Amino acid sequence: PEMTQVTTRNADPDGLGIQQLSMFCFDKAGDFISRVTPEQTVNQDMLSGTFEAVVPKFTKIIHFVANQNLESFNEQGNVGRHENSIIPGLISSSSMLVYWGRVECPDNQELDDYIQNTLPDKTVPLYRNQAKITFDGGDLFVVTGFAVCNGYAFGTVAPFNTETKKFDWSNTSNYLSLPNDRTKFTDPTEVNETDTEYVFESDNPSADQMYVVFRGYPQNNPDAELYYRVSLLDGNTQEPLSIIRNHHYKIKITGNLENGVPTFKAALNTPPVNNIWISIDEDIPEVSDGEHKLIVDETFVVYDSGEEGAQGRQKVLKYTYGTDTDPMKPVSEAEKPTVTWMDNNVAAPGISNNYDIS
């Protein structure tokens, strides 16, 4: 999801893009060698760009970490420590969104050869370490502000699977990587006049739930503006939802609201409203109309500018389109999708679409 023009208490608007990037280099055994700061060029959207770096000779594993405050990181003291010990221990506060990605080169291949010839599209996907929460009042309701309450003040930089002992995260993963420090942030005293909030992962236990207070009024009736409280519940089970990094939680108002109160303070203790529906989107978009489904493989990547022909290179974006069934099936040649530019002021106008129906 887009991350521009956002004003929130939980994430500084100046911290929503890539401000700085570090590369943690490990050998084939996963032992730390050194940290490298690449020369980078960040695009105007602050969410993509290119980088160049010289890494140690025996590097086989690289963790990419963007926007993390590393002033207290003891590089010399960490030499020889395993990646499973170093990376899961990196903790961030809510002042900036932190991005993380990892590449691992096979033991029988040189790193440069792997990046140039094997790494898919020569790109490294980066995952945000916070979740995104938005409101949609639809045609029924105008939301004039909201605030998240009872959330964690800190979060881990990278997702680490404690069961497999691997960094095997993808957008379909549902495990949490919580810090040892479960300190809660100070709850706000008023809503933020924003359409987006960012929060750290949370197990969201029933006895200590994260919740949202929002302010708004029915369409065409601004004099009826009130405050409401909503719990983040699964629509099927009515159990609290786990808050997972790099996921988008959309709170949609689907009917007339009850239990509105005149002040933010009163809303903190009022019963949750009804007629609320929450949907969860991975950062990798998936859209369905009930009959057909479109899945886009990549929306957030870092490009390697050191490759041959960087100025004239072509970028391949993969998608899957077919029937909304299990398993998904391709459509016929006559039904294949059309791909066009919506807006383009940085690339050559040519665009091609190869749809494989095999």
Where are these regions (language model features)?
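Contiguous beta-strand segments within globular domains
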Residues: 1-6, 130-134, 306-320
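Tryptophan-paired
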Residues: 6-77, 111, 132-245, 319, ...
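Acidic Ser/Thr/Pro-rich low-complexity disordered segments
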Residues: 31-35, 70-104, 159-167, 330, ...
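Short strand-edge motifs at loop-to-beta-strand transitions and within beta-strands
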Residues: 49-51, 120-122, 249, 353-355
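Extracellular and analogous surface-interaction loops
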Residues: 53-55, 123-127, 201-204, 306-310, ...
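Beta-sheet-dominated interaction scaffolds and their linkers
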Residues: 124-125, 269-318
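Surface-exposed binding patches on compact interaction domains or structured appendages
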Residues: 294-298, 310-316, 320-357
